[in-house]
């Protein structure tokens, strides 16, 4: 049973901005309603510019959360596009390895999108993670409650420390166009979901998941977003080896960038 959650901003520092204060307040209240204590790590609420310009402080927040014996879960605030910049501050002097070894209990690490890079960093050191909800995108949902599918799995994770079975949602939702405080309590437009599309193989399978956001993983091999992604990811050997992938369920999700089919194919083939 999860009791204490550490909130970290390892990518964008959005939750420190005034324009999302109403969402953040909703999310913090929801976590408390789940019976959770919330620890906001020192730099998580510093805002977009500060967080962007201080990757070392982001890394320090992660290390502190891992070492904090009161913390049961590390919840990422939101994605972004540059959490790869934490690599030198986590691996150059074995900082992350030592923090994991120092921690006396297993912690849940949760997030998605650019957080893929953090998942791969932790995977590299044998620290199992869960690819799932982020604080701002999911817990802070502006409807009167979290979306049912999202809430179901979040509750299962905080109550049991695991996810037993993943089934498709009955519905899918359109993204909001109004994120202002006046939109609090309004429902998203939803549509019936037809479920998973089976291309080949057995319809039911089990195993460990490895993967994440396609654009983030593509950045490991492409410098078009930032000039140093390839060099940093190569230096610290971030991408999993062929042996790591053996027997895993490949997870790929695309971001709000909505790549066209040609670019999608290029990213997958890379």
Q: For the regions a protein language model found, what residue spans apply to each?
A:
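Hydrophobic structural segments
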Residues: 121-124, 210, 215-217, 243
């Amino acid at each position: 049973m999860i009791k204490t959650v550490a909130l970290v901003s390892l990518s964008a520092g959005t939750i420190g901005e005034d324009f999302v204060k109403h969402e953040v307040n909703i999310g913090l209240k929801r976590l408390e309603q789940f019976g959770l204590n919330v620890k906001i790590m020192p730099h998580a609420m510093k805002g977009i510019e500060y967080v962007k310009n201080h990757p070392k402080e982001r890394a320090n927040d992660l290390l502190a959360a891992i070492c904090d014996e009161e913390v049961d879960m590390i919840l990422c605030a939101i994605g972004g596009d540059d959490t790869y910049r934490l690599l030198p501050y986590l691996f150059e002097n074995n900082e992350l390895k030592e923090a994991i070894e120092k921690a006396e209990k297993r912690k849940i690490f949760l997030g998605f999108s650019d957080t893929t890079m953090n998942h791969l960093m932790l995977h590299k050191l044998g620290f199992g993670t869960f690819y799932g909800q982020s604080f701002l995108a999911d817990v802070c949902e502006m409807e009167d409650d979290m979306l049912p599918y999202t809430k179901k799995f979040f509750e299962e994770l905080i109550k049991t420390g695991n996810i037993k079975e993943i089934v498709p949602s009955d519905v899918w939702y359109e993204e909001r166009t109004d994120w202002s405080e006046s939109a609090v309590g309004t429902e998203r437009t939803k549509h019936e979901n037809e479920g998973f599309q089976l291309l080949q193989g057995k319809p039911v399978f089990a195993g460990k998941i490895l993967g994440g956001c396609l654009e983030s993983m593509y950045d490991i091999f492409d410098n078009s977003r930032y000039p140093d992604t390839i060099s940093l990811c190569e230096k610290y050997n971030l991408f999993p080896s062929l042996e790591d992938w053996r027997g895993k369920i490949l997870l790929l999700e695309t971001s709000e960038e909505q790549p066209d089919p040609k670019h999608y194919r290029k990213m997958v083939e890379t």
